[in-house]
Amino acid sequence: MGHYAPDGAYPEGIGYWDYGTSFNAMFLSAIEKAFGTDYGLSELPGFLKTGEYILHAVTPNLKNFAYSDNGGTAFLAPTMFWFYDKTKDASILYNQVQLYKKDGQKRIKKNRLAPAMLIWGASASLANPQIPARLSWKAQGDNPVCFMRSSWNDSSA
């Protein structure tokens, strides 16, 4: 989990983030359910901040900031609901709600972890997604990144 330090950026882009982080979230959920604690693993440097990495890596027109060998199409990431559950930051789900509104049924059918959204997002209100306050985000780490935008809901921003 050291790759998330110090600020939550992931070295290989958001496709690999989704793959690796989804297993982290499932493991942390399982041990927390079994033992009542995740033994501080979610508190490791950068981990709880990494949801912001994905939030900011998706553009207002629902494309990915594509680097490494990742594609440019944004995708539904059920793991973002785990980050919502842990942080109670409703804005972390902003892009997920937009993606679902665009073509959610198609996206859910293709996602192996879609049922986890029901568990991790049980307390989320998705009817009126909270627009994130920050228009920029930067992170150091294995592959430093900086994302900037002028708006969350203007597709040309």
Kindly label every feature range from the protein language model.
Residues 1-13:
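Acidic/His metal-coordination segments adjacent to aromatic residues that form catalytic metal sites
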Residues 16-157:
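Carbohydrate-active enzyme catalytic cores, enriched for enzymes
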